C-alpha cells in the first residue's frame, strides 16, 4: 500500500449526485490501494478531528452510495477566512492531517470550497508539509468558472424542467375556473442557470414557462405584470419561473430578507415567489399559486440526469488520479467537446481560476425581451438533463438508498476549541 492516506470532505449544499462523486473517489482510491478518510460534516469535521474510515464499508455499500442523494458523510456551511484572519484554524487543520498521515486532501464543493483548498495547499507548502490539495466541483447553481457545467446541476435542471412541465398541465386544466398564474421559485443567488433550464419544459412561445426571471436582467415590475396579463389574455393561464436572486435596477434583491446573511456571507434571500404572487393578485386580480421547491430540487435522485451522474463520478475519479500524480492546487473540470453529438472530457484547471469566481449566463443565452432563453441556451442545457441515472427500487416501491456505517477513526489530538 502506498504510504499516506487521502482525506475527502463535502462542503456547502448537497446535491442528488455528490455521493456519486464520493463513490468515484473511494472506488478509484481503493483500486490504487489508498485508504480514504472522510471528514464528518465537512471542514468542521477535519478541524474537530472527527474522521471516518471508509475502508470499513463494503464494495456493495459504496456502489449503492453512487445512487443515494444527500451527503453521506455530512456537509457544512463554514467558510475559513484569509490565512491572516484564520491562521490558527489552518494550522489546526494541518496538525490533524499530519496526525493521520494525510498526504492528499480532496475538498468537494463550490467557489468558496475551491478557495479553502487553495489556501490549505499554500499553507502546507509554507510549512513544508507534503500535501496535495485537489478541489472537486459541485453545485446546483452551475456558477463555477472554467468548467462547462457543474456536477449536481444537470439533475437539478432536469427536476426543474420536469416539474414545470407537469405543473403547467395542472394549471392549464384548472385555469378556466381556478388558478390562472403559477409561480415557481428556483435556487440561484447571482446566476440564473437553474431557472433558465426550466425553459426546456416548453417549445413554443405559448408553452410554459411563458416567463423566466433571472438575476442577469434587472427586474421591471411593470413589464412583468404586463407580460403576465398578456399571457393570461392570450392562452388563459401563465407559468412563471423566478430565480431567487432576481434584482431591481438598483441591484437590490427583490426578496431581500432584511439584510441577513448565511455563514458564507451571502445574502439570505426570502421568498421571491410569494412576493411576485402578491403583486399579481393585487395588481391584476388573478388567482395565483406559488411554490418553493427548496431542498426538493437538489435532492431528487429519482429524477437524476444520467449525464450528470456520470460526470459526478468522473470528477471524483479524476481528482484521485490528479492527486496521486503529484498535482496540487488543481480541480477537475468538464470540457465540452461538441453539442451534437454531446461529448465531454475531464481536464485539470488551476484552483485560483475557480476560487471565488462566479460564472453568470452569457447575454447570448437570454431572449431580448428578458423573459426566456434563446436557442443557443437550449443547445447548451439540453444534453445536461439527458438520460435516467440508474436507481434500484425496493419491494415497498421506494428507491433503495444506503446508510453507511461511518466508523469513526480514533482521535490522536487534544479537542479543538475553535
UniProtKB/Swiss-Prot annotation:
Optimum pH is 6.8. SUPFAM superfamilies: Phosphofructokinase. Substrate binds at residues 139-141, 187-189, 244, 295-298. Keywords: Cytoplasm, Glycolysis, Kinase, Magnesium, Metal-binding, Transferase. Mg(2+) binds at residue 111. GO terms for molecular function: 6-phosphofructokinase activity; diphosphate-fructose-6-phosphate 1-phosphotransferase activity; metal ion binding. Its cofactor is Mg(2+). Its main location: cytoplasm. It is found in: Cytoplasm. It is an enzyme of class 2 (transferase). It comes from the Bacteria. Pathway: Carbohydrate degradation; glycolysis; D-glyceraldehyde 3-phosphate and glycerone phosphate from D-glucose: step 3/4. Optimum temperature is 40 degrees Celsius. Non-allosteric. Diphosphate binds at residue 13. It catalyses: beta-D-fructose 6-phosphate + diphosphate = beta-D-fructose 1,6-bisphosphate + phosphate + H(+). HAMAP family: Phosphofructokinase_II_B2. Catalyzes the phosphorylation of D-fructose 6-phosphate, the first committing step of glycolysis. Uses inorganic phosphate (PPi) as phosphoryl donor instead of ATP like common ATP-dependent phosphofructokinases (ATP-PFKs), which renders the reaction reversible, and can thus function both in glycolysis and gluconeogenesis. Consistently, PPi-PFK can replace the enzymes of both the forward (ATP-PFK) and reverse (fructose-bisphosphatase (FBPase)) reactions. Belongs to the phosphofructokinase type A (PFKA) family. PPi-dependent PFK group II subfamily. Clade 'B2' sub-subfamily. Homodimer. This is Pyrophosphate--fructose 6-phosphate 1-phosphotransferase. The lineage of its organism: Bacteria, Pseudomonadati, Pseudomonadota, Gammaproteobacteria, Lysobacterales. The gene is pfp.
Amino acid at each position: 500500500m502506498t504510504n499516506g492516506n487521502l482525506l475527502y470532505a463535502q462542503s456547502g449544499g448537497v446535491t442528488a449526485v455528490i455521493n456519486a462523486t464520493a463513490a468515484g473517489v473511494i472506488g478509484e482510491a481503493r483500486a490504487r490501494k489508498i485508504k480514504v478518510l472522510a471528514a464528518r460534516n465537512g471542514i468542521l469535521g477535519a478541524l474537530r478531528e472527527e474522521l471516518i474510515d471508509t475502508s470499513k464499508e463494503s464494495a456493495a455499500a459504496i456502489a449503492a452510495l453512487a445512487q443515494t442523494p444527500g451527503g453521506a458523510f455530512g456537509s457544512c456551511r463554514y467558510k475559513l477566512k484569509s490565512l491572516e484572519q484564520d491562521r490558527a484554524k489552518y494550522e489546526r487543520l494541518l496538525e490533524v492531517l499530519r496526525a493521520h498521515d494525510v498526504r492528499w486532501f480532496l475538498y468537494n464543493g463550490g467557489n468558496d470550497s475551491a478557495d479553502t483548498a487553495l489556501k490549505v495547499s499554500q499553507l502546507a507548502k509554507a510549512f513544508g508539509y507534503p500535501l496535495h490539495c485537489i478541489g472537486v466541483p459541485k453545485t446546483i447553481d452551475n456558477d463555477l468558472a472554467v468548467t462547462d457545467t457543474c456536477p449536481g446541476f444537470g439533475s437539478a435542471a432536469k427536476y426543474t424542467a420536469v416539474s414545470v412541465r407537469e405543473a403547467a398541465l395542472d394549471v392549464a386544466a384548472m385555469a378556466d375556473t381556478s388558478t390562472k398564474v403559477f409561480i415557481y421559485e428556483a435556487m440561484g443567488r447571482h446566476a440564473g442557470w437553474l431557472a433558465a433550464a426550466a425553459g426546456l419544459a416548453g417549445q413554443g412561445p405559448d408553452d410554459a414557462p411563458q416567463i423566466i426571471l433571472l438575476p442577469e436582467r434587472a427586474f421591471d415590475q411593470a413589464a412583468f405584470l404586463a407580460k403576465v396579463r398578456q399571457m393570461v389574455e392570450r392562452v388563459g393561464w401563465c407559468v412563471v419561473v423566478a430565480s431567487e436572486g432576481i434584482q431591481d435596477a438598483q441591484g437590490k434583491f427583490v426578496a431581500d430578507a432584511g439584510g441577513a446573511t448565511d455563514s458564507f456571507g451571502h445574502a439570505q434571500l426570502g421568498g421571491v415567489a410569494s412576493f411576485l404572487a402578491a403583486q399579481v393578485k393585487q395588481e391584476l386580480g388573478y388567482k395565483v399559486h406559488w411554490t418553493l421547491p427548496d431542498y426538493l430540487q437538489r435532492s431528487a435522485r429519482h429524477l437524476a440526469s444520467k449525464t450528470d451522474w456520470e460526470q459526478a463520478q468522473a470528477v471524483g475519479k479524476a481528482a484521485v488520479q490528479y492527486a496521486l500524480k503529484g498535482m496540487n492546487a488543481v480541480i477537475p473540470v468538464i470540457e465540452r467537446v461538441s453539442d451534437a453529438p454531446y461529448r465531454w472530457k475531464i481536464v485539470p484547471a488551476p484552483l485560483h481560476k475557480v476560487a471565488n469566481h462566479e460564472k453568470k449566463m452569457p447575454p447570448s443565452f437570454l431572449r431580448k425581451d428578458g423573459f426566456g432563453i434563446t436557442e443557443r441556451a437550449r443547445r447548451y442545457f439540453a444534453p445536461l438533463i439527458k438520460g435516467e441515472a440508474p436507481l434500484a427500487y425496493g419491494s415497498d416501491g421506494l428507491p433503495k438508498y444506503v446508510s453507511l456505517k461511518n466508523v469513526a477513526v480514533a482521535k490522536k489530538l487534544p479537542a479543538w476549541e475553535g
